[in-house]
């Protein structure tokens, strides 16, 4: 699968805000954005006023970067969201939130979405008792996500279990048993990403 391999901190600087792509590092003074919050490049400190199209494009890019998705796949999510009942923008965010890599991250098994993606790819997780290593796998309400038995003894997963996260309302965690459950589909109020999905819909509707 194609993926972005450039400097992660440049993405935060490009969007003009912390996207928390490096997990715990983003909360320290080692964070590149804390030291240089202007855009990368020779003219980065002289930000120009964006056109309406530019604002819409930046919002879409921000969403892509938060969830670690390339353009072609992001477009497919949008097209699927259009066919679903309800509000297209909210449907789009719901599809992104219910990716397995994001759910693993939200459950606290990963300090960032990037780390969660890596752990899923390496086969550390089960969905309803079966190994799933596809990061884009769409979970459903009622699904149980658990850490494989042989992975639970590693220092990384012990650390996750000892430092549980506050979970969103649509997830339920059982850290002692290294598992979590999707108890409902997320509502817009449950999704805390700093994205204005209406701008993305406006961009793709042109």
Curated annotation (Swiss-Prot):
Task: List each copy of the S4 RNA-binding domain by range.
Answer: 98-164
The UniProt entry, under Pfam families, shows: Ribosomal_S4, S4
What PROSITE patterns does this protein's entry cite?
RIBOSOMAL_S4 (PS00632), S4 (PS50889)
**Biological process annotations from GO:** ribosomal small subunit biogenesis; translation
Q: From which domain of life does this come? A: Bacteria
Which GO cellular component terms, listed alphabetically, does the Swiss-Prot or TrEMBL entry include?
small ribosomal subunit
The protein's role, per its UniProt record: One of the primary rRNA binding proteins, it binds directly to 16S rRNA where it nucleates assembly of the body of the 30S subunit. With S5 and S12 plays an important role in translational accuracy.
Q: Which family does it belong to?
A: Belongs to the universal ribosomal protein uS4 family.
Protein name, UniProt field: Small ribosomal subunit protein uS4A
Q: Which organism is it from?
A: Clostridium novyi (strain NT)
What broad taxonomic lineage does this protein's source fall under?
Bacteria, Bacillati, Bacillota, Clostridia, Eubacteriales
């Amino acid at each position: 699968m194609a993926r972005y391999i450039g400097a992660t901190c440049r993405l935060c600087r490009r969007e003009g805000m912390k996207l928390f792509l490096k997990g715990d590092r983003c909360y320290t003074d080692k964070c590149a954005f804390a030291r240089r919050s202007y855009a990368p490049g020779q003219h980065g400190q002289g930000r120009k006023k964006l056109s309406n199209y530019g604002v819409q494009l930046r919002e879409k890019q921000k969403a892509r970067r938060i969830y670690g998705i390339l353009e072609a796949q992001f477009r497919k999510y949008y097209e699927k969201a259009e066919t679903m009942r309800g509000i297209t923008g909210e449907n789009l965010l719901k599809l992104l939130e219910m990716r397995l890599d994001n759910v693993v991250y939200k459950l606290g098994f990963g300090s960032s979405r990037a780390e969660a993606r890596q752990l899923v790819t390496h086969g550390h997780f089960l969905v309803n008792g079966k190994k799933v290593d596809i990061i884009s796998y769409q979970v459903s309400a009622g699904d149980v996500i658990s850490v494989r038995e042989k992975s639970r003894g590693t220092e990384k997963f012990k650390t996750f279990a000892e430092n549980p996260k506050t979970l969103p309302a649509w997830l339920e965690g059982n850290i002692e048993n290294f598992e979590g459950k999707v108890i409902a589909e997320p509502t817009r109020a449950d999704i805390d990403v700093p994205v204005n999905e209406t701008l993305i819909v406006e961009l793709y509707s042109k």
